[in-house]
Amino acid sequence: MSRYSDPQKVFSADYKDLLKIEGIHPNIVKLIKEFDDWEPVKEEVEKLKKLKLDLLVLTDPAYPKNLYNIYNPPPYLYITGKITKDDKRAISIVGSRIPDVYGKKVTEQIAAELARNGITVVSGLARGIDSIAHRACLKAGGRTLAVLGSGIDFVYPPENKSLYKEISQNGAVLSEFKIGTKPEASNFPRRNRIISGLSLGTLVVQATEKSGSLITAEFALEQNREVFAIPGNIGSKLSKGANKLIKKGAKLVNDVDDILEEIGGFIGAKNKKKVLNTVQIEGLEPAERLIYEILSNEQLHIDQIIKMSNLDSSIVLANLLSLELNGIVSQLPGKYFLIS
């Protein structure tokens, strides 16, 4: 899809042209050229229309940029509700499905404060910490995204139907799974990578040593995102997972300021840009000027800069360093860059 803007063009493309695409094996080309089973595709489109759902593909400009930058972003997302540009300022909150009073209180406080600071809260609509985070965010007037481990038409757990509806009206519910997919256990690790991928960082509130929320934290690390954890009672099983993360280097969180400090470079970045005059721009090297112009609209991940500049990665890194040393560009957590 990086070469063909329209999926239909992929199927009508010449065999030899498809072979020129990096990573496309002859067997894959053969499958593409021989594909004629369009009936299931038509059925899926009809389901989308009937359920009034949106399908967002990887090449769509509206595809979430945080998620786009992970190693294996889902090629498409089923969505009910709306994802906005401001949702790139997001923190995921995950944890135990059976939290204690302390876990509930902390989650409510942090989620509400994030919402009041214009941060979107991402979670998985599960029982416990997930649901508490979604509700606290909504109550504070914020936006929240829920990622499902099932088809988007399958609300799980069933008692969250009203919460599902409220989220879709004040954020979005999304899934990479086909309509009708049941919430199988094997789906949830895939869901977790999306939760962390949508976010600048992941906060683990309470988790046992084998909690699925630790998988989300692992994905966050792999995706070069921040990992935060709420410290807990050393004698409680619910604290062992989060305390272990802190021991390994996760940011200890006492209040929302600990999170905002780490992602501060992403907040209000548009108002902090350094605008160069014509003389200063002309004084830049050609590659520096190109990178400056690419970064003129918003912060971008290093992979995006390399792709958009069409320059070798070593050249991009060298020129970014030069711009950074001259105070023109700043680096943010997760290998993002923006105009200072």
Across the structure, where does each feature detected by a protein language model lie?
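Short, small/acidic-rich helices and loops at N termini and domain boundaries
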Residues: 1-61, 229, 302, 328-340
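Glycine-biased, small-residue-rich flexible motifs in mid-sequence functional cores and linkers
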Residues: 49-50, 57-340
